UniProtKB/Swiss-Prot annotation:
It comes from Aspergillus niger (strain ATCC MYA-4892 / CBS 513.88 / FGSC A1513). The keyword rRNA-binding does not apply. This is ATP-dependent RNA helicase dbp3. Keywords: ATP-binding, Helicase, Hydrolase, Nucleotide-binding, Nucleus, Ribosome biogenesis, RNA-binding, rRNA processing. Signal peptide: none annotated.
Length: 495
């Protein structure tokens, strides 16, 4: 009897908690809708495009917009900078050097300027930094008119320090015009300077690990953050930052926070994160249906050459001589190696062959990495040899060609590598030297090539089209899923 009463009591408490959670979620959705509707009254499209123009834009850019909020006002893509909401004209001044918004900017801006939570699923190099950055700055400007804004008011989290620095640099160009301070927080450097920057920063761009450290020691209070961006969410979760992200978000307000997530893929773990921290988000997909599998930019011409391991470096020199001659002698070429020692050896080889080469890999300090990147960006060096530390998020303008000397450990990293070319609407070119050593990745690579309508060489097909099971982070190739519902086998020993 006592056991029955205890079960009834537990069941009652469970129902009460569930009801409380549902009521809380409903109220949050209502608050979000009210906020969005309030913002929508401020945002008006001065030249609303015709249905035919909208349909053409969506079709040409493979844009799909899914809004889960019932009764929400239907907003149209912002296809011209002249359609942006009114604000301090100085904020929009840098836009004069651009002709028109990118597809991801056009599709997400109406919702972001209206205060809605947004999930953007798009390739790297699609202009998403400005996509989430401009609405954030406009939001901060509006807050400043009502009084002194709390610091920090906006937090933007990225998976690597290189990407954090890139986001910081791009947003700072706009922020400094309207007197908004931006701090860049990442590991590998002393914390004291970062603590000082946090005292005046309205926007914090950070990697998860260092931000959590500063949060834990009381250097930063995130209790009044109103604008949160998770950039390259899939990559952050791949790197094991899920718990750090949850700890960072926990003290932030719920109903008054606008949350933005950008991701290149849409696996279950990213969906779960979105379901946990976002309210009735609008999902904007560029380039077809969202997929859990990595997809390459279709504007990149992918070429796979099957070679013998000892032929790779000789073939690399041949390719560089071919693609850096005559009028193309100053074209930027990014060369990827798998290991640091390999990168150092290849860099030395190319230097001895007379190429203007720089290197970036894990053994270099922050200043050395920065120096190499700047040299490559400015054209002082026309070849950059890198390991995967530079594969994700770096925005290096006008990379004409990516060469993979050694195939990466995963096809996801392959997609990230070649994504350094063909950015911001430009055409790109990637050449991969594939050997028998890499044959475990042949099936996954073939799928990426086919999905992007690229040629699959016969030599690659010989390795097989089977996709190998992804290894577990902790248990490697010996990991297997265990069916916990399966009846155990009883083992009986004879006497």
């Amino acid at each position: 009897m006592a056991k029955r009463e205890l079960q009834d009591k537990g069941s009652t408490e469970h129902r009460a908690k569930k009801k409380s959670r549902n009521e809380k979620h409903t109220k949050k959705a209502e608050d979000s809708q009210a906020s969005a509707q309030s913002s929508e009254t401020q945002y008006t499209d001065p030249k609303e495009p015709s249905p035919a123009v909208i349909e053409k834009f969506l079709e040409e850019n493979s844009v799909k917009i899914t809004d889960t909020l019932e009764g929400a006002t239907k907003l149209h893509p912002i296809t011209s900078f002249s359609h942006l909401p009114t604000c301090n004209s100085a904020l929009y001044r840098p836009l004069e050097s651009f002709t028109s918004p990118t597809a991801i900017q056009s599709a997400t801006w109406p919702f972001l300027f209206s205060g809605r939570d947004v999930i953007g699923i798009a390739e790297t190099g699609s202009g998403k930094t400005l996509g989430f950055g401009l609405p954030c700055l406009k939001n901060l400007q509006d807050s400043a008119k009502k009084g002194k804004p709390y610091k920090p008011t906006a937090v933007m989290i990225s998976p690597t320090r290189e990407l954090a620095m890139q986001i910081h640099d791009q947003i700072s160009k706009f922020a400094e015009l309207v007197d908004i301070k931006v701090a860049c927080i990442f590991g590998g450097v002393k914390k004291e300077e970062q603590r000082e920057a946090l005292k005046t920063a309205a926007i914090v761009v950070a990697t998860p690990g260092r931000l959590k450290d500063l949060q834990n020691d009381g250097s930063v209070d995130l209790g009044k953050v109103k604008y949160l961006v998770l950039d390259e969410a899939d990559r952050m979760l791949d790197k094991g930052f899920e718990q750090d992200i949850k700890d960072i978000i926990r003290p932030m307000p719920v109903s008054k926070r606008q949350t933005v997530m950008f991701t290149a893929t849409w696996p279950p773990v990213v969906r779960d994160l979105a379901a946990t921290f976002m309210t009735s988000p609008v999902t904007v997909t560029i380039g077809g249906e969202p997929s859990a599998d990595p997809r390459a930019n279709t504007r990149i011409k992918q070429v796979v050459e099957v070679v013998k391991p000892h032929e790779k470096e000789q073939r690399l020199v041949q390719l560089l001589n071919k693609y850096q001659k005559g009028p193309s002698s100053s074209d930027k070429i990014l060369v990827f190696c798998l290991y640091k020692k390999e990168a150092v050896r290849v860099e030395r080889l190319l230097w001895n062959k007379g190429f203007k080469v720089a290197g970036i890999h894990g053994d270099l300090g922050q200043q050395e990495r920065f120096k190499s990147l700047e040299s490559f960006k400015k054209g002082v060096s026309t070849v950059l040899v890198a390991t995967d530390v530079a594969a994700r998020g770096l925005d290096i303008p006008s990379v004409k060609l990516v060469i993979n000397v050694t195939f990466p450990l995963t096809v996801e990293d392959y997609v990230h590598r070649i994504g350094r070319t063909g950015r911001a609407g430009a055409e790109g070119h990637a050449i991969t030297l594939f050997t028998e050593v890499d044959k475990a990745q042949s099936g996954a690579l073939i799928n990426v090539l086919k999905a992007a309508n690229q040629d699959v060489p016969e030599d690659l097909l010989k390795f097989g089209a089977t996709v190998k099971k992804k290894q577990h982070d902790a248990y490697g190739a010996f990991y297997k899923d265990v069916d916990t519902n399966k009846t155990s086998t009883k083992i009986v020993f004879d006497d």
